[in-house]
């Protein structure tokens, strides 16, 4: 168990770096660019209850929310993998993907199906299909 936890922390760190590179951090809530309203977003891409127009966070709040959220997304990735092997880097990328598309979408995606089948190159190519 200790080894698994250590691996999860490493994968979460990788995911956090990926998310920080792609998302950027905004400390004042902003509307969804597509709808001009809900869902309002703040920090490193956080949405949900309490995030609305006028909400302002500190950097510590944004970083803390990301860290908390990633623990849940990591659990969703482990479940989606269903025991299939994954390196820390692969898990980190999958956690980052789950953060953006949700664990349900990841679990039913061609990306995860290819990974579970051992087609790692095919799985890697699937990331680009989600780039909108």
What function would you assign to each model-found segment?
Residues 1-132:
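Cell-wall polysaccharide-cleaving catalytic domain and substrate-binding groove, primarily
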